[in-house]
Amino acid sequence: MTIEERLVPLLHHLNEVGLIGPNAFKFGGPDELLLVSGGPASHLAKASMLCGPSRRRLVVRQPKIQPSAPHSPSKGDVRLTSQTSQLVGHIEEWKHGCWYHATTIFDETLAGVLEKLQAFSTQTEFEGTPLPALPKRPFWSGCLAYDLVQWTQPLTLQHPPEEGTILCVLFFVERYLAEDKSTGELHAFSIKGDDWSQRVGSELSQAQEK
């Protein structure tokens, strides 16, 4: 049985005991992030991960941009231009049961914003010994919209997203539960001083004994 097949009861139980989701507000936000390595176990699919509550996130929204004049790239009419609106990322931190704005980073390119995001990361390694294929220290993960192409290529969209539309949400993952696809074993990891992994491990042990 894989983590995908166990997902619903596992998420429900960890939510009930306050280790993920809305009930885990002491650890971080209610957002749930699952990184599934699909297919059979192989050198390309070694582990799946359920990320624990995050205490920091990056949110990027669509700024107000003047649409490009009508043209047809499919007919060879490709119009290159320099993006004049900077990409703005809002760093938010989880405090007192809510997300609060902490600071803002901005750049002319997506790569530039992601590079500046390194200043809000940490080099502290996870306790325990994660599988070779798994992260050894906290990392950023989440969703990026295709419309971010506005800051990766010299293009102006004819139909850009509405102003304020969310283009990117990245969570800083400082704790996670991983499934070794070759053995089916589950292991929880977190940084020093964080008992989240111990609590998850205890819940898993109790579940196996039942």
Place the predicted regions along the sequence by residue.
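Extended accessory regions or peripheral subdomains of proteins
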Residues: 1-104, 139, 143-210
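Generic internal hydrophobic packing segments that stabilize the cores of diverse globular domains
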Residues: 84, 88, 107-118, 137
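Short coil/turn segments at secondary-structure boundaries
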Residues: 101-108, 128-131
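Short acidic (Asp/Glu) patches
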Residues: 110-129, 153-164
